[in-house]
Amino acid sequence: MVWEVKTNQMPNAVQKLLLVMDKRASGMNDSLELLQCNENLPSSPGYNSCDEHMELDDLPELQAVQSDPTQSGMYQLSSDVSHQEYPRSSWNQNTSDIPETTYRENEVDWLTELANIATSPQSPLMQCSFYNRSSPVHIIATSKSLHSYARPPPVSSSSKSEPAFPHHHWKEETPVRHERANSESESGIFCMSSLSDDDDLGWCNSWPSTVWHCFLKGTRLCFHKGSNKEWQDVEDFARAEGCDNEEDLQMGIHKGYGSDGLKLLSHEESVSFGESVLKLTFDPGTVEDGLLTVECKLDHPFYVKNKGWSSFYPSLTVVQHGIPCCEVHIGDVRLPPGHLDAINFDDSGVFDTFKSYDFTPMDSSAVYVLSSMARQRRASLSCGGPGGQDFARSGFSKNCGSPGSSQLSSSSLYAKAVKNHSSGTVSATSPNKCKRPMNAFMLFAKKYRVEYTQMYPGKDNRAISVILGDRWKKMKNEERRMYTLEAKALAEEQKRLNPDCWKRKRTNSSSQQH
């Protein structure tokens, strides 16, 4: 068996492997059969057709491996399947009613969808550009597309439970041993990991290290009951409560405070030390302990009972911590690390598909990214065009209604388009029209519109918008900054997912001028 490597003389050239098989081992003839892979990847920058040979003498010695003829390949792809395309010819419009098991039999399933997207030029995993942590991250999604299955798999029941709060978490002098941002330099996916002795806890590797209960460093506490009712940093409180060993720790003043979780009673945004913060009030569930008010950062993640990761600003949280989150609501119960519900809870049906795999934090973040890309791609193609069939065969067509209703909606959209075209205007309900992302004020108004509507029951929506606009003008720059950052991140994500949307907008504007 002879191996020969042929490569192009250029930085990112695609290498071709020529495998020369010796048929004499199979008892046939002495002729040689040449098997060559000549797939030219269009996603490779600067590729040309140079076939210059380069002999490599420092290759390691290769040994032939006898394969078992009784074992069949786990994944088989037909000749018309590539790393970027679907076998479109094998599908038709009548496949939307085929159950999911049939798709698996045809070897086209959810994992195949992710594999095709992962190897496409648009995939962030295939891009070599390096992102700065302070710059807007391109991997972000709205709160509707966020899902908790991006979490690493829960700890198996066979693993032994450790104490909920190891003492080195309470010691400022003992730093976390290894803290890194997984895949930050390659794909821009930020997933902070804490690989310390408490990795066996319910806190997965992607969970940020807490100082006390569910609160991160930089949080300020104010207990409504007790000897000290003044504001104090969570680091100082943890250091005052912590002792030399676990037994002394149990004798702390607030021993077991909120051990079953902290229920959110109220929340508001304020400015503390020149920085916009969240002021949250929690109920520990016991009258004798009293309430707790905290001031935390806007992107602070919380693990909510029966809900998973949650945040007041999911877009900021996924940028800062790499944790996809749902939105926080009044009444949510925050769980501390090591809580039984935090270890065993999993609300994702899609996540069951991946339970048999041993995901690292980097892998789980990649799963979230690719899955989010797949959903966004299907959503953008579901309303019409040639991509509509892709959405119909994906198994998610149930969310779009029956075929009859789809045809009816398409007909109505077409009728509106013809009517608007005849009057010289551009249809705003075009099937390929992308929604413009919300700006900072729209995000602000969305958050407070319900509250102001309840405050002024006699006013209509337009009057409420005027009131919201007045409050927006009176806000300080640091108070507006959080909405500006979130709007900028959403705009970057919209540009990444739908680059043609912005071009089409400019084209429509120019056509209207003519």
Swiss-Prot record:
Q: What is the lineage of its organism?
A: Eukaryota, Metazoa, Chordata, Craniata, Vertebrata
GO BP annotation list: Wnt signaling pathway
What does this gene product do? Transcriptional repressor that binds to the promoter region of target genes. Plays a role in the regulation of the cell cycle and of the Wnt pathway. Binds preferentially to the sequence 5'-TTCATTCATTCA-3'. Binding to the histone H1.0 promoter is enhanced by interaction with RB1. Disrupts the interaction between DNA and TCF4.
Q: What is its main location?
A: nucleus
The Basic and acidic residues compositionally biased stretches are 170-182
Assembly: Binds TCF4. Binds RB1. Binds the second PAH repeat of SIN3A.
Q: Where is this region: Disordered?
A: 150-182
The organism's superkingdom is given as Eukaryota
Q: Which Gene Ontology cellular component terms are annotated? A: nucleus
Keyword Nucleus appears in the UniProt entry: yes
Residue intervals annotated as DNA-binding region are 434-502
Q: Which cysteines are joined by disulfide bonds?
A: none
Quote any Pfam family the record assigns: AXH
Could you tell me the keywords of this UniProt record? DNA-binding, Nucleus, Repressor, Transcription, Transcription regulation, Ubl conjugation, Wnt signaling pathway
GO molecular function annotations of the record: DNA-binding transcription factor activity, RNA polymerase II-specific; RNA binding; RNA polymerase II cis-regulatory region sequence-specific DNA binding
Question: PTM details?
Answer: Ubiquitinated by the CTLH E3 ubiquitin-protein ligase complex, leading to subsequent proteasomal degradation.
Q: Which residues form the AXH domain?
A: 203-345
InterPro entries for the chain: Ataxin_AXH_dom, Ataxin_AXH_dom_sf, HBP1, HMG_box_dom, HMG_box_dom_sf
Q: Where in the cell is it found?
A: Nucleus
Where does this protein come from, organism-wise?
A: Pongo abelii (Sumatran orangutan)
Please identify the protein, giving its name as recorded.
HMG box-containing protein 1
Under CDD domains, the record lists:
HMG-box_HBP1 (cd21988)
